[in-house]
Swiss-Prot record:
One of its GO terms (biological process) is mitochondrial genome maintenance. The lineage of its organism: Eukaryota, Fungi, Dikarya, Ascomycota, Taphrinomycotina. Performs an essential function in the repair of oxidatively damaged mtDNA that is required for the maintenance of the mitochondrial genome. Binds to DNA. Belongs to the MGM101 family. One of its GO terms (cellular component) is mitochondrial nucleoid. Keywords: DNA damage, DNA repair, DNA-binding, Mitochondrion, Mitochondrion nucleoid, Transit peptide. It comes from the Eukaryota. This is Mitochondrial genome maintenance protein mgm101. The gene is mgm101. Its main location: mitochondrion. It is found in: Mitochondrion matrix, Mitochondrion nucleoid.
């Protein structure tokens, strides 16, 4: 939790973490920065007004009794995450530009040229498609970018943050807008899980990649991967599900792979 709360708050969060349930219901504590929010659920115990009051006084976080949430005071500076992850989404917008956090400029105004459409909706190469061990087909993110670069040209498209980064105890999510040739094309929320607070920055990049994949769906890029019939045919013709054994734990399970690939350490096929 030390990367989520400022040092003044940490001194009292240790006490607060012992107070989870109020009338048998879990208490969800929200800690807000100017542009990011963090959800923290203590481990066990009963919420104490005295503890929450001291927590409020020493962490610069305002407690609202009717909502059981904490919000920052208006006259205080943004809380840092141990001088780490900060979300600076409020950028200055040029006079001639558009604020893509709010603008829908160009959405559905006209279709792109036939040449661009042909590049975006071109069938995928079989060799480009990968499969995860759990059987999910996917296209590597770099290949989405190559398709967009081929269709719009490098610099002719971009992802604009739309809204704030939301960081919970297990995942990061943020909404992005795909802008092509100065027009809003699609809006999607990307999400990415993480297992350690040190990985929040990396998870935020994974969140952006996930949003790009979802935005490309509206342009018809890799649309086959959303078609159940195509997925079944591809897996039947190009993939195989086999039993593998973990050489360290000796546990066996069934995993998917492409027919021409082999599993690497610590797995071996049995």
């Amino acid at each position: 939790m030390q990367t989520m709360l400022g040092k003044p708050a940490l001194q009292y969060f240790g006490k607060l973490s012992r107070y989870l349930y109020k009338n048998g219901e879990p208490i969800n504590i929200w800690v807000y920065s100017r542009n990011s929010s963090f959800s923290v659920i203590p481990k066990n115990g009963l919420l104490s007004p005295k503890i929450t009051q001291r927590f409020y006084q020493n962490s610069s976080i305002q407690y609202q009794k009717d909502k059981n949430i904490y919000e920052p005071k208006e006259n205080l500076e943004e809380k840092e995450l141990s001088e780490g992850f900060l979300d600076e989404s409020r950028l200055e917008i040029p006079e001639a530009g558009h604020n893509w956090e709010k603008s829908f400029f160009g959405l559905s105004s006209q279709p792109f040229s036939k040449e661009i459409c042909d590049l975006l909706t071109a069938p995928l190469e079989v060799d480009d498609i990968e499969i995860k061990p759990d059987g999910i087909l996917y296209l590597p993110e770099i290949k989405y970018r190559r398709i967009l670069n081929k269709a719009f040209g490098p610099g002719g498209w971009g992802l604009a943050p739309r809204g704030n980064t939301n960081v919970t105890s297990k995942s990061v999510s943020r909404e992005y807008a795909l802008v092509c040739h100065g027009r809003l094309v699609s809006v999607a929320r990307g999400e990415q899980t993480y297992f350690d607070p040190e990985g929040i920055a990396t998870a935020s990049e994974g969140c952006k990649s996930n949003a790009l994949m979802r935005c490309c769906k509206d342009l018809g890029v890799a649309s086959e991967l959303w078609d159940p019939r195509y997925i079944r045919v591809f897996k039947r013709e190009n993939c195989v599900e086999v039993f593998v054994e973990n050489v360290l734990t000796k546990k066996r399970r069934k995993l998917w792979r492409r027919k021409e690939d082999k599993f690497s350490y610590p797995y071996k096929e049995v």
